Each structure stands twice: as structure tokens, then as C-alpha cells.
């Protein structure tokens, strides 16, 4: 965040401007990285500076032309997009042709501005990465973008290995036994509860569970209730599987992740013989409940209930049974067999992260985002604008008070997860001028603008059409991650019609309607398309629907305004005042900045504002 002195410097149209551009380049011939330094007018750092005694050659023709958007261009709401721009270097003499032998893509670049003097007096107006170079006969254009690509990666890479513990040739076999090779473990019960498969020879293509193992005789005993169909002998080849890391059928499958408070997720069955399931690759806060065909495993202190929710709503006590949880590994084991789909309610990830020194469970949107980007995205605390997260955490009732949950059963992209979590509550994320992750949410303009623009600064203004005010807003909440159909449900659930209906609907919808005669004022007004959230409480979903209707259920102004001003003073979501003798702006109107295009070479800013 800029200091007051830096903002005052940018506001001073007469203050001298020197732009410094520093970027890393990889020498394809020498296989080494070096930093290159350029400026608008030529600059050399002093011996006490860092970097010291470094000359910034005066080749910068256009220091920075960059576009930043809250959402996709032309849209209000939806998924976040990265900032893009260009920097142009003068190459009339061909001196920069050497850059053809360098790789810039994915390397860091920063642009600073200052009046000269000490290098430390310059400050960042852009920190990001480079894409590629475009050439002309007179200039080099470097395409730049923010650091959003750092999060364009898999959220989880840990996979099940389907570990084979040992292979060999049997020495003998019986009805429910097999004598392993002499090289097998000498530790009693070493292979207990592991699976053994006859992979060749006599008894080929049979698989059984080992229930005991004698390390002295090498005899593995299998379940007597499932004897060998064909007894193994000394020609039988075998493999013993350690299912603690998933059955062989799960080999290379990405392990699941569970964050916050989720309902009816489908766990991964890692060991069918032992009825063992995994909900998260790591420790969790609690496995709240387990269901077979929607029928919760446990009992109510009075009456016959299919789930704890209804039991407790009627004032009784629910007791879980029928499964054994292991919160340290994010797994549970069923006591008995099940023939219907297994689901679970879970309070997920309980671990340490850059903001929590000890293992901690978190369930607020901002906290989940910080956990994901630091533990899975590789973002350091220094790369996060914590003040923006502090503001976001209290920006709306649903964000402040609502618990959310997100389940990733088979891997996925971090950006997709962030888009789902943040945009579902009307939020956005980006990277700041300093290269730090920023989060925010579109709300009503603030009462006090950070800048005001009048006819003296406004070069052009264009009014854009906006959506017709909505009649109502609806949110989907309390998501059931398994989409149930009638064929999935246990018999007891089928006869519990209200509960059955909830399972089949997947979401609990909350609608909020406008009260200002919208249908009379706007004959084509319609209800907004439903937004599905990850809130675990429909009451917070109601608050979010209400907020959205108050935001989108009234007439709005949307302008594209080009102003003659010093760039880099504004940010996305800043509040500005537009005052002009047009469009009903005579008395000035506070509006939110939803997009910015800044051109340092012309000292112009084009912004899209909503109010």
C-alpha cells in the first residue's frame, strides 16, 4: 500500500518523473540468469544503494500501459481475471537485438517511479511477470501480467500409490492359508489386514484378506469365511498389497481435500475389505456424521430418525455409531458392510499454515483462501495484502458470519477453487501493484471518495447500458456434495419424505425480493439467475441474497471515463466521485472503480465506474 508521501508525489503533476524498469532474463547460451536495468531518462544508483553503482540505460519509451479488471471485461460479477499490459523499449539502433538470445517468459519484472536521487526513494507501481517479446524495427514491446499464473496449478499432487508390499512364489497353500517365500518378513502379523492376490500359477486370479501371519513359519492365514476356490501351492505367484495408501485400483489417483464445513461428500474408498474411507489428505477437525444411502449411522435418544438434524431439531440427542473416525488421517472405517452410497459430513482441514503456527480448523472464506494459497499455492505471507483480507472479512454479513466448505475429491486447479469460493459471495481477487494477493467484494460506494474528477480532468465520458434491475435474488446454500437420486437412498429414507426431498434437492434456496415497485418501473425486470454458494447456513444465504438484491435491484449508472491525471493513484474497487453537467452528475456521484487502464506515457487513466 502506498504511503501518503507517495500519493502526494503522484498527485503533483509538476513533479519530475523517472521510471525504472528491472527484469530478469535467462541467457540461453550461458544457461544463466541476469537482471537487466532500463529507465526513461537514464539513472545510476549510488554506492550506498541496493543495487549499488548500477546504470539504468535510458531506453524506456513507454514505462507502463496496464489494464486491471475486477471481473471479466464488460461484466459485473463472475470470475476474476489477471492484469495485462506492455512496456516499450527504444531499439532504433538495434542495441536490444541481443534479447533474442534470452528467455523472459515467466520471469519477474518490476516498474518503479521516482524523481531521482536515491534509489530507495523510488517505489513500485507494478510487480509481476513477463509473457513474451514483440519486435518492430524501432522498439521492443514486453508483454506483462500480474502473478495470477502462480496459482494456475494443481491444488493437490499427492496420489495413491497402490503400494505392493511384497511379491514372491509361495512355498505351499491350504484351504485358508498360503506359505509365503522364505524371504518374507520374520515379524509376526507384519502382513495382517493386508490383501494377498495370486497373480500366477495354481489358484491364479484370487484375492483374499490376511487376518494373521506367523513370521517364523511364513504362513499367512486368510479369512475362513472366504476360503480359496483353488488352493495355492509351490507354483503360485503372489502379491501382497498394503492398502494404507489405497488399493492398487487407486494408483495415481489424486487424494481428496476437504476445507471448512461440508455435507454429504463422497469419500474415497481406499480399502474395501476393511471398509476404510478417506475424506481429506491430512488431519481434519471432525467427521461429524456418516451416511449409508442418506441414512445417518447412529441413533436418536427417542423415536426413529434417519438423521441427526431432525432428531436434534425435535429436542433429542443423537449418538453416532457404526463407524470409527481417525481425524489425524482424515479417514473413517465402517463397522459393518454397506450396499448403498456412503457420504459424510466433515469439518475439514486442521493444519498449520503461514497464519496459524499450530494446527487450526478454519471455515471463513478469507481464512480458507489464505490457507489454500499458502499451503498449496506457494504464496508467502509477504506476498499477501493482509489489509485487504481484513477488510474483506467484515465486508458483508455473509462473509463475516458465514461458515463455508469446499470439497476437492479428485484434484483441481487452484484458480478454479478460488473463483468458486470468492465469486459465489460477490467477491474478486487480483494482485496489487506491489505484486501481493488482494481480495475484495463489490459493495455500495464509500461515503468518502479517494479522488474526485470534474470537467477539468475528464477528457471523455461514455455511458454504458446496465442490466435491468432484478426482481429478486436467490442463493443456493447448505450444499449436499452428493447429488442424490431415488435409487441412491436407503429404504428408511425413502419413507421419510421431507428428508428425502432435501437430499434430492442438493441446495436449500433462499430468495429475497425487492420492495421498490420494480415490476412497475421496469416491465421487463426478471428474477436473477440463482447463485449457488458454499455457505453451510441458509440464514447467511438469505443475507447474501438480500445484499445482492439491494445492489442489483435498483437503477445503476455505469460509465467509461477517461481522465487526464497521474496514473497509479487508484485501485480496483476504489470509490471516486464523478461531477459533470451531464447524465445527472451535476452534484457529483460516488462510484466504484471496476476496471482501470493506465498509460504512463500519456498520463491518462481510463476507468469503468459503477454507482
Segments from the language model and where they lie:
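C-terminal extracytoplasmic interaction modules
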Residues: 1-2, 10-13, 20, 24-37, ...
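Short strand-turn-strand beta-turns centered on an Asx-Gly dipeptide
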Residues: 291-294
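Small/polar beta-strand repeat architecture
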Residues: 138-141, 147-192, 197-262, 298-325, ...
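Conserved hydrophobic positions within beta-strands
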Residues: 130, 210, 593-595
